[in-house]
Amino acid sequence: MPGLADLASLPALVTAVAFAAAATLVSFGFGLSTLDRWIGRRRDHELAWTVALFLFAAASFALWAGVATGWTGPIFRLFYLCGAILNVVTLAFGTLLLLVGSTRVRPWTWVLVALGGFACGVVLAAPLETAVPSEGLPTGRELFGPLPRVLASVASIGGAAVLVGGAVWTVVRLGRRGRDRTAGDTRLMWANLAIAVGVVILGLGGAAFEEPTPFAATTCLGITVVFAGFLLTNPRIAAAPSRSP
């Protein structure tokens, strides 16, 4: 009976909606945290991360709306553009600003803006190959032609490589200090490990799952782990042990 089938799928639907809502709230709160840091210190990488996290929140909100109310063309385009392309590249750009330095990387901001604008035009104008399914988790593979999918692949793989590589490089650099490593250095090592693990969770979730519940769950878990790593980088927290006698 259709009624019984609908009831059987209800727990999975509710779970997916809950995880998508949680991912939206966590990423939005994460963005507010980086915005607060940027307002206080005016560092370029924190502004880039703020923009990226609000883009992540927009993608999570689209996931939330799509799972809860049914997918439509505009909701899927927002989800795909912000989640698969723009937020990863902008996060990676922020990491380059931090690790390489604003002086060298800042001139490339306009390249990022131009590529982002190009991606927006492509995703918003690309014809849909088939009707957007109202249920489940639509994918670019079934709905878009080659160009939007290539943009998403390059952005996701390249951005994740920069994020994980930057975190691992920081851990190795701090680890080499040996006995000279401070409590703050150790905290930063754990923070970067958490960030790397969170990015890997997000990447694996996006690649491995095509059902809304596990995808939303890994999205929520991944951004939460990255947020935890970010909180560990707080200079006030890192400096706390040094104030003890």
Features from the language model and the residues they span:
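Extracellular-loop-to-transmembrane junctions of the mid-late helices
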Residues: S9-A23, G121-W169
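Hydrophobic alpha-helical transmembrane segments of multi-pass membrane proteins
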Residues: A22-S33, H45-G66, L193-E210
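The cytoplasmic-loop to transmembrane-helix boundary for the fourth helix
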Residues: L96-L137, P245
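Internal transmembrane alpha-helix with an interfacial aromatic "cap," most often the third helix
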Residues: F28-W38, W64-T72, C82-A114, P241
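Membrane-interfacial loop-to-transmembrane alpha-helix junctions, especially the N-terminal start
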Residues: G40-L53, R106-V111, G184-I195, F215
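Alpha-helical transmembrane segments in multipass membrane proteins, preferentially the mid-helix core
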Residues: G29-S33, T90-L97, R149-T182
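C-terminal transmembrane-bundle signature of multipass membrane proteins
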Residues: V164-L174, T186-P245
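Non-cytosolic membrane-interface motifs at loop->transmembrane helix junctions
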Residues: T72-C82, P138-T139, T213-L221
